[in-house]
């Protein structure tokens, strides 16, 4: 039976068009999904859009259109972005989908039946931009002495009737989860932040807003809409038709990884597992909280106004180049920088100069000297064996790197071997061997092609089009190059 693997992105909020930060997250998830498929897993990859809440309601009103018409338009932009980025998501969930609403009502009922929901009065600070409630000690002072959320967004005082969830009830269970599963939240720095937050004492949280029209209504009290985070987080099980008792839910849940931005770690690592504990469901295996993509050192966000249109970047650089830069230039999990100069220099150095140069020099000789067919190898000398050994080690190195989702390290190890192969090719000078030692020339070309084959297989999750084209040119007679299983078979020969 094939092992399953479930990966999700955070669903993108539809208060504006996609920016490069959204592209970064969905590309990263796609790379992981594609790698797992290469390794033989049955992968379910989910992304989608979060379409309810006061921000969306206000934006639609500002534009003079119906909220549903507005989110239909913006959601389509996110769907098209994923396609343009060559993403292989199995599903795209929308919180306005009927299937999602059914699951939200079901999880609310489970929480209520457990005695974990009660009606009370909420008095406190709320950020419309964050769609989040905050305690006063969490707020920061602005230059003019007004309060801001931890993300630097405006907050307002609200005093209204609200349904509450007994988050405080699950404090010990959450701390036990973090203690028993050290990799539940990665990177480790985020785990420490969350543990400190929970250890400081949890308060019950508001899970509804009153008199907000754009949301999923509480079934027993239509004056209330279900708070956007309980609504939004449920998407991960809605896509699997949890409330219908589906086979998909049995197969893929619990999720192997929720891939999210670091600014929403608390919602995923505290509130979501607490909701699941209450509902009697398993928690996800891991929350990977990646850093921000920075525009010249500044966080890219709609509120700051420094967003970058990813579609324009695709037109300027190409999809493989953008995917490669975003995932290789910065250790995954850390904040990363974007600029035109960085993308061009990075892509030129590694894709054009290293991989492109090696493949062009090798394949050109094969077509001119070997009638376009990869030659048979002769006896292998120490130089050949050393390079091949480094290449064959890549399979295990890649598995080790991707086990912790260190995508940059996985790519660096591949390009280290490509760099060695370029030096090998230059040192061996196969173009000088044609007349005096054609057997040796054939061996050098065979070894170089073997490096290109191995690295192209391993690069497929990131450089989707380019690596497949290279494999198609070099190995048109092979149909098994699409999986790592074929790589292993060749290594064991």
Predicted regions and their residues:
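An amphipathic alpha-helical micro-motif enriched in hydrophobic residues
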Residues: 417, 442-461
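Long, amphipathic alpha-helical stalk/connector segments used for oligomerization, subunit docking
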Residues: 369-373, 391-399
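N-terminal Rossmann-like or analogous alpha/beta NTP/dinucleotide-binding catalytic cores
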Residues: 2-119
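Structured secondary-structure scaffolds
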Residues: 2-47, 99-103, 148-368, 410-414
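Generic long, charged, amphipathic alpha-helical segments
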Residues: 428-438
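Conserved small/polar residues in nucleotide/adenosyl-binding loops
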Residues: 476-483
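Cys/His-rich short segments
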Residues: 116-162
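Hydrophobic alpha-helical segments, chiefly the membrane-spanning helices
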Residues: 487-493
């Amino acid at each position: 039976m094939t092992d399953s693997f479930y990966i999700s992105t955070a669903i993108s909020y539809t208060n504006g068009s996609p920016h490069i930060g959204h592209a970064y997250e969905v590309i990263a998830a796609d790379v992981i999904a594609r790698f797992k498929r290469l390794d033989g897993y049955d992968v379910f990859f989910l992304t989608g859009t979060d379409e309810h809440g006061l921000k969306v309601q206000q934006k639609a009103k500002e534009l003079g259109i119906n909220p549903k018409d507005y989110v239909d338009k913006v959601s389509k932009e996110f769907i098209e972005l994923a396609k343009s980025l060559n993403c292989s998501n199995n599903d795209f969930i929308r919180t306005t989908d009927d299937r999602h609403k059914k699951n939200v009502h079901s999880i609310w009922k489970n929480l209520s039946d457990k005695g974990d929901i009660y009606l009370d009065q909420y008095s406190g600070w709320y950020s419309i931009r964050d769609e989040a409630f905050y305690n006063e000690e969490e707020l920061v002072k602005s230059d003019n002495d007004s309060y801001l959320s931890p993300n630097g967004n405006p907050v307002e005082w609200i005093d209204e009737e609200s349904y509450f969830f007994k988050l405080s009830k699950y404090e010990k269970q959450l701390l036990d989860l973090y203690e028993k599963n050290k990799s539940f939240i990665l990177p480790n720095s985020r785990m420490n932040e969350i543990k400190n937050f929970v250890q400081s004492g949890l308060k019950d949280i508001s899970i509804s807003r009153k008199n907000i029209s754009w949301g999923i209504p509480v079934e027993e009290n239509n004056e209330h809409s279900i708070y956007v985070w309980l609504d939004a987080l449920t998407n991960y099980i809605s896509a699997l038709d949890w409330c219908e008792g589906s086979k998909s839910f049995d197969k893929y849940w619990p999720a192997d990884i929720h891939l999210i931005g670091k600014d929403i770690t608390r919602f995923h690592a505290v509130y979501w597992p607490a909701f699941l504990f209450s509902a009697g469901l398993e928690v996800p295996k891991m929350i990977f909280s990646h850093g921000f993509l920075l525009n010249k050192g500044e966080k890219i966000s709609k509120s700051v106004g420094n967003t970058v249109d990813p579609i324009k970047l695709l037109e300027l650089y190409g999809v493989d180049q953008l995917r490669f830069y975003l995932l290789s230039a910065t250790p995954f999990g850390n904040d990363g920088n974007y600029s035109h100069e960085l993308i061009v220099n990075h892509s030129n150095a590694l894709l054009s100069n290293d991989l492109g140069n090696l493949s062009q020099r090798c394949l050109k000789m094969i077509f001119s000297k070997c009638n376009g067919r990869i030659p048979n190898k002769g006896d292998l000398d120490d130089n050949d064996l050393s390079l091949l050994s480094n290449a064959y080690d890549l399979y295990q190195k890649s598995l080790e790197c991707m086990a912790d989702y260190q995508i940059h390290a996985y790519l660096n190890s591949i390009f280290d071997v490509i760099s060695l192969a370029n030096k090998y090719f230059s040192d061996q000078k196969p173009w000088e061997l044609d007349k005096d030692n054609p057997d040796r020339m054939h061996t050098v070309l065979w070894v170089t092609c073997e490096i290109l084959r191995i690295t192209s297989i391993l690069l497929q999750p990131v450089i989707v089009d380019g690596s497949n084209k290279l494999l198609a040119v070099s190995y048109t007679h092979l149909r098994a190059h699409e999986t790592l299983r074929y790589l292993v078979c060749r290594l064991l020969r």
